[in-house]
Design a protein with these regions (language model features):
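Conserved phosphate-binding/catalytic loops in two-lobed NTP-binding clefts
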Residues: 186-209
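N-terminal glycine/serine-rich phosphate-binding loop of ATP-dependent small-molecule kinases
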Residues: 1-86, 132-134, 139-162, 175-194, ...
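Glycine-rich and small/hydrophobic secondary-structure elements
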Residues: 47, 204-220
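Gly-rich Lys/Arg/Thr-decorated short loops/hinges at beta-loop-alpha junctions or inter-strand turns
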Residues: 26-30, 118-137, 203-211
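Short beta-strand segments
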Residues: 86-90, 126-128, 164
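Conserved small/polar residues in nucleotide/adenosyl-binding loops
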Residues: 233-240
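Glycine-rich phosphate-binding loops at beta-strand->alpha-helix junctions
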Residues: 165-174
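N-terminal structural subdomain of ketosynthase/condensing enzymes
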Residues: 94-126
Length: 240
């Protein structure tokens, strides 16, 4: 690529519009706003990129940097269009997502409705194990309960799984063991471990974050794969 002809491209994908800005070597800007294609966001990106490159009379290979922002993950959560997601947690903590921190918008309103958790109750599986807050093993991981959890994940045909065990932020050993077993039996499943995503104290926040990450992983993976394929048609090096 000729460095003297290098350009920078910004793409921001929203639910309604996709905005593109191309910065050319001489400092001029070429902009475009196109309708987003919700079924396949990459279509609007590809169309918009082709337009700005043509208007600027530059080739895709002259784009040095692509900066991309998207609401794909946010929309998947808001619209509840994420993956069929399961949760593996410590025995006794299956209902943590509902219990939360007992904070209600209207404290004394018994009829108020709360948003449903991203993981259905039947897709939450418990394993017998326990660590204390120092990461010391109080109860070793029970392999039989772990195997039952994996069997449940397989029978429900889940696409993604969040593994969030109590006090895993202090010691990820049990989470890693569960994840290794899942990968061995179900290599196609997208896995998210709380000890990797948010290794911090406070179980509800850690579990919610891990579940949200698992919920959108397959959606984003498909989106980015499609986007990379799209970029192959405009530049010989989509990863550069």
């Amino acid at each position: 690529m000729n460095g003297e002809l290098a350009c920078r491209l910004g793409v921001d994908v929203g639910g309604t519009f996709t905005d593109l800005v191309l910065l050319t070597p001489d400092g001029s800007l070429v902009t475009r706003k196109v309708l987003s294609t919700s079924g396949n966001y990459a279509e609007a990106i590809f169309s918009g990129i082709a337009d700005v490159l043509q208007e600027a009379s530059v080739a895709g290979g002259d784009v040095k940097e692509l900066i991309h922002g998207t609401t794909v993950a946010t929309n998947a959560i808001i619209e509840r269009r994420g993956a069929r997601t399961g949760l593996v947690t410590t025995e006794g903590f299956r209902d943590l997502l509902e219990i939360g921190r007992l904070r209600l918008m209207r404290l004394y309103d018994m009829d108020q409705e709360r948003p449903a958790p991203l993981v259905r109750r039947r897709w939450r599986f418990e394993v017998a194990e326990r660590l204390n807050h120092h990461g010391e093993v109080i109860r070793p991981l029970d392999r039989d309960t772990a195997e039952r959890a994996i069997a449940g994940i397989a029978s429900e045909n889940l696409e993604a799984v969040a593994v969030c065990l109590i006090h895993a932020y202090a010691n990820p050993k049990h989470e890693q063991a569960v994840a290794a077993s899942i990968r061995q039996r179900l290599p196609q499943v997208y896995l998210t471990l709380s000890s990797e995503v948010l290794p911090e104290i406070r179980e509800f926040e850690r579990t919610s974050t891990t579940v949200a990450n698992a919920y959108v992983m397959p959606v984003l993976d498909r989106y980015l794969s499609t986007l990379e394929t799209c970029l192959l048609y405009t530049s010989p090096s989509p990863r550069d």
